[in-house]
Every structure is written in structure tokens, then in C-alpha cells.
């Protein structure tokens, strides 16, 4: 194990200095307590909520915190949501939920569902391209500009039509660090 560790570390060291990486979705600093928690939990499969039921309780609390932060319209005390391991998975889950809701509504109205689209800024998380390819959804991007460093709402609305599933806001635009007005 030590030889394998040294080979991998030597091979990747120059590429894996997070404090020097400003281009991807990585954490550049982590408190020692976060590191300790991760090390202590590395052998647990948190997806198995029957084995680790407290994880479901913590996830529910996090979902409620975010739902309240974003002023969701739900009145019940326990908000609806799903646990995602990373931002790509969270985008996929949210995208599928929005697409299925749009599709169900269109079918109930007797309208076609063959040309769905999503509208978002060009500062989107890259998984949205893959999502749109997988589900055959047209991706409509609103360019970021010097005067609009987050989603330009007026331009986004111009790109919407009856086939628009939703406008996807970005919380933490990679290029600017700013949040779309959610």
C-alpha cells in the first residue's frame, strides 16, 4: 500500500495543489474539523439511510434550511427535497424534477412535449449541457456581459416560450462568484 500511495502521490502532486487551482470546483481550504469528520466517516455509506438513519434527519434539516433561505412557497414544516452528493448530481435531480413537472402539466393540457427547453446564463454549471443532451432538451443561454455579470432577467424572459421548463438560476457563478437573483 505504501508503494502505491507514493507512486500516485508523486505522479499527481504537481497537479493537485488545491490552493493553486482557481479554475475548477475544488475547496482550497478546509478546517481541520472538516478533515477529521471526513476521515472518520470515510467507511460509511451515507446513501444507505436504513443503516444510517440520522443522515436522513440531517439531510432533511439541510433541505429545510435551503428551502427557507430561498423562500420556497411550501407551507408545511418539512420541505420537499433530495440529498445530492455533489453539484452535478443536484443539478441533474433538480432538472429531472422540473422537466417531469413541466411534462405532466403539458400532457394534462393536451399540449406537445417534444420540444422542451431550459433558459440559463452562460455562467452555468457544465453539467447542464450534459443534462440537456441526455434528455433531448434545448439549452438556451443568456450571455454574461460586463454590465450583467449574473443572469439578465429581461434577456432570459425573451428566450422563454410555452416549451420552457424553467429558468435555471446559478448560486455562485464560476466566473464572477456572484449569485443570480433567485
Give the ranges of each region predicted by the language model.
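PLP-dependent aminotransferase-class I/II
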Residues: 85-88, 108-181
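N-terminal entrance/gating region of PLP-dependent enzymes' catalytic architecture
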Residues: 1-78
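Alpha-helix boundary/capping residues
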Residues: 11, 97-98, 139, 163
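Structural motif corresponding to the C-terminal cap of alpha-helices
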Residues: 66, 70-74, 98, 102-106, ...
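A generic secondary-structure signal marking the coil-to-beta-strand transition
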Residues: 34, 79-80, 135, 163
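Conserved active-site and cofactor/substrate-binding residues in soluble primary-metabolism enzymes
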Residues: 33, 53, 57, 89, ...
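Conserved beta-loop-alpha segment that forms the PLP phosphate-binding cup at the N-terminus of a helix
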Residues: 56-59, 63-64, 78-111, 127-131
